[in-house]
């Protein structure tokens, strides 16, 4: 039977119906799982009451290499407010610390058990050079605190019809700042992504059961 499972396509695993019990039941029903991992997580849910208990359950019942995909989108408070984003930079940092507190320990396959991943979006309302500086400032703080990020996804915003973004600016900031995106993206890759990868997988690390695609 199937032994590899990813509980994906949900907006926030932590707000699922009885997530701890669900993981316990999956493990009890299929004790010989090879992989059990989750998908998206709202950082606010990690910080709120009960969030740490769910985090500990994910570390206990899921397999190592697990990622909490955080839709932070921007660490610039001005951009967060202008776009009605769910997570403030302060809440995002708290959630990153909590996930690291319980999930940074290395598992039997050689990977940390449970780490945050950060999604950043370029082209949001009120974005400017200060927005990139704020993003880099947050990433620098993460590095200085010795925290781990499994990955950073950087995308350009998709302006969909009849959305808040389309009605309040559309592609204005995307068009205005597009000339900076390669530079901004490359700075994150060189100053954060690559050093973080060396921190997560130092030279000599052996990773078990690797599947390539």
Where are these predicted regions, by residue range?
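Extended C-terminal regions of large enzymes
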Residues: 132-133
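Auxiliary Fe-S-binding modules of radical SAM enzymes
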Residues: 31-33, 103-104, 110-112, 136, ...
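Conserved SAM/AdoMet-binding glycine-rich loop
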Residues: 1-117, 122-127
